[in-house]
């Protein structure tokens, strides 16, 4: 039961000191799996979900490489506009992890294309991403900023509430199709992989570290060229 005054009465008890506790993860210094789980639940998956739920439309302006964490930040936006030299990639399988924390691959791409994207870890060009429906528009690099501004000007001229409700409706449809439930399940698999890597390799990341992965990606790109 709460009478409302349980949260404090202005002018009466504001002077009292309380031992304040946060209801959300606020630590990354605990032992074992809790450290990685708390950090990635809050900073990666949780943050991305909150960005996706913003009432205002968001646009990702992408040029160059959009890799791993960058991919998550682009995916949470409502629209993605990319330059023709942009590419997208989730290579973290090489680190012994089954994909980034915000696991939206099979909603952003056809499942078979998503599997190829994950299994091989290769770069997907902006044009290919556009063909697959992951990107809204591809323009020359020199035109990217102007194109994004044109779209934002159009959006700002739309009725605000209708735009907000349209976004909520689209997000709700995605949620009903299982997007969030799937991501939550994939997050569990992600941390099972971390735990397995810790037991087998002594580190929660197995295979390549960030530096080695960057070198491998560069070599792969040069070979493709």
PLM segments and residue spans:
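C-terminal alpha-helix plus adjacent terminal tail
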Residues: 1, 8-9, 13, 18-20, ...
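Glycine- (often His-adjacent) and acidic-residue-rich active-site loop
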Residues: 1-46, 212
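Low-complexity, flexible helical/coil segments
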Residues: 25-38, 95-99, 115-121, 172-178, ...
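Crotonase-fold acyl-CoA enzyme core
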Residues: 49-161
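Polar/charged side chains located within well-ordered beta-strands of beta-rich proteins
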Residues: 40-41, 58, 190
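Non-membrane alpha-helical structural segments and their capping/turn regions in soluble enzymes
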Residues: 34, 38-45, 142-145, 160, ...
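A broad, low-specificity signal for short, low-complexity segments enriched in glycine/proline
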Residues: 19-23, 42-43, 76-79, 97-100, ...
